């Protein structure tokens, strides 16, 4: 089966044909680094992490780029309110973001360009747009003139008349059209700024991604991804800038967008008290379980996210890791056809995950001779999705970083004391130790090789 992907630009599923099969190029809009990543961010990055994994499985080389926006109004505001220098805010928050995504088990992108290291490329692109008549300078700003691009609005399916009608009542007097958007803005006192032909200033948000994609992936590349909320204005404006600057029919051949996330039926919001950062969830749950919960719905569909969903995902992973635990042999296997076919069908994760459950069920029904092969198929299938990558014993012994729990040395000491009690036929003491451990969330399992343990 060939890979098919839903293209927001055409509103249809299409067979994916890479521009260069020897190097598939993927770009995803990354974080603006001013605060902790929240679970909505994590949904988007988990979806495109899976896409990158699948592409790397299917093609010899994939260049996966995901940017860091490190100059932005929100960053400046955070710096001014906290008193922390802008460089400190962005460095600290970028490190937090990396730690959180690593804990979820996401791959690092092949390229992670930062906006502030691409200012010269942005200035050069803005200059080309001005020279070609697509942009103009006014009062220290440079603006893209939307009427200069007749088919502006193709991605979001918005006409220019709709854009003008939807513009704010008070339009900046220097704008030629209410729909025009900023490419460059003057820096206010105390704000970061760079020298340019239009004075000291900083780039608009949209030009950043256009310049970075061109620098690392070329004028036209294969896939551009992001959240559904970025279709307009961000991605629409990226397309306008890039196509007009380079004279191309498209910026990316395929545009993909992940759906919205709600919390127990409500929009996630700090005022409703249902706003979860990734870091908060990692204090309660393993990162692998959070990511499985995020992939439980199809990436384009709305996802109603709850802690109960994460707990269910944890139980599923317990079952899958349980298949691998204690086996002397797990046979190497190819990814099963039905799992690969599900993922090649526009990343159909609910179907792919259902096949993982079927493999686990088949394992438990199988005889001893068939089990190593079934375990190998489960490991290969889950591995393509980025799961079952750790040692099974480490999984069962793990505890979220923000929770209290006995350390391994204390648990092993208790197991040894129980072993000695059983040897002395003091079964009451052995049972007491088992019960005491269970009260603290430690489950003992006696087997031919001795006693193993896991966290409940």
Swiss-Prot record:
Q: One Pfam family this chain carries?
A: DALR_2
Q: How is the cofactor bound?
A: Binds 1 zinc ion per subunit.
Q: Give the required cofactors.
A: Zn(2+)
Residues spanned by motif 'HIGH' region: 31-41
Residue sites binding ATP per the record: 270
Its EC number is 6.1.1.16
Gene3D superfamilies attached to this UniProt entry: Cysteine-tRNA ligase, C-terminal anti-codon recognition domain (1.20.120.1910), HUPs (3.40.50.620)
Q: Which CDD domains match?
A: CysRS_core
Q: Which UniProt keywords apply?
A: Aminoacyl-tRNA synthetase, ATP-binding, Cytoplasm, Ligase, Metal-binding, Nucleotide-binding, Protein biosynthesis, Zinc
Name the SUPFAM superfamilies on file.
Answer: Anticodon-binding domain of a subclass of class I aminoacyl-tRNA synthetases, Nucleotidylyl transferase
Q: Where in the cell is it found?
A: Cytoplasm
> Where on the tree of life does the source sit, at the highest rank?
Bacteria
Q: Which catalysed reactions does the entry list for this protein?
A: tRNA(Cys) + L-cysteine + ATP = L-cysteinyl-tRNA(Cys) + AMP + diphosphate
Q: What NCBIfam families does the annotation carry?
A: cysS
Protein known as: Cysteine--tRNA ligase
- Taxonomic source organism: Rhodospirillum centenum (strain ATCC 51521 / SW)
